[in-house]
């Protein structure tokens, strides 16, 4: 109770203000000054605060709308890219399969062409060997024949004398005469 009494005594000693003013010292302000300041702030600040909040709200909403549009556009681009990727993968698979089959076809063609070339080369080699063999045999025959003829001529020349020569001529003339007489 003593505290309450001191409060009233203390209020009685306050001097009266000569003019109206705002006390800027927060610890020394009274309830009326605080109410006036808060009321003025609410009255004048309400419109400004509302405008600021509305502007902020509009910016946030437009940012959200832009983000949604960008998201939709990005999703569309992503879907187009996925479709394009699938198409490219299908084409790549097709090219790969065609490439493999083309490689196999070319490999078979190359093997066939090489086989044919080898067969032709083998045939040509065999023909060449046959002709060379025939030529060599003909040369050997010719050489043997020449040597035989030379040997026979040598033998005849060494064995023939004039008397044998005349007898041979007479025998041949006799044979020719017999042939003529029969006609």
UniProtKB/Swiss-Prot annotation:
Molecular functions per Gene Ontology: ATP binding; proton-transporting ATP synthase activity, rotational mechanism
Keywords from the named record: ATP synthesis, ATP-binding, CF(0), Chloroplast, Hydrogen ion transport, Ion transport, Membrane, Nucleotide-binding, Plastid, Thylakoid, Transmembrane, Transmembrane helix, Transport
Subcellular location: Plastid, Chloroplast thylakoid membrane
InterPro entries for the chain: ATP_synth_b/b'su_bac/chlpt
Subcellular location, principal: plastid
Domain of life of the native organism: Eukaryota
Topology term for the membrane: Single-pass membrane protein
Any Pfam family: ATP-synt_B
GO cellular component, one term: chloroplast thylakoid membrane
Signal peptide feature range: none
Chain ranges passing through the membrane: 25-45
PANTHER family with a match to the protein in the record: ATP SYNTHASE SUBUNIT B, CHLOROPLASTIC
Remarks, miscellaneous: In plastids the F-type ATPase is also known as CF(1)CF(0).
Stored HAMAP family: ATP_synth_b_bprime
UniProt family annotation: Belongs to the ATPase B chain family.
Role of this protein: F(1)F(0) ATP synthase produces ATP from ADP in the presence of a proton or sodium gradient. F-type ATPases consist of two structural domains, F(1) containing the extramembraneous catalytic core and F(0) containing the membrane proton channel, linked together by a central stalk and a peripheral stalk. During catalysis, ATP synthesis in the catalytic domain of F(1) is coupled via a rotary mechanism of the central stalk subunits to proton translocation.
Description of how the protein assembles with itself and partners: F-type ATPases have 2 components, F(1) - the catalytic core - and F(0) - the membrane proton channel. F(1) has five subunits: alpha(3), beta(3), gamma(1), delta(1), epsilon(1). F(0) has four main subunits: a(1), b(1), b'(1) and c(10-14). The alpha and beta chains form an alternating ring which encloses part of the gamma chain. F(1) is attached to F(0) by a central stalk formed by the gamma and epsilon chains, while a peripheral stalk is formed by the delta, b and b' chains.
Name of the protein described by the UniProt record: ATP synthase subunit b, chloroplastic
Protein encoded by which gene: atpF
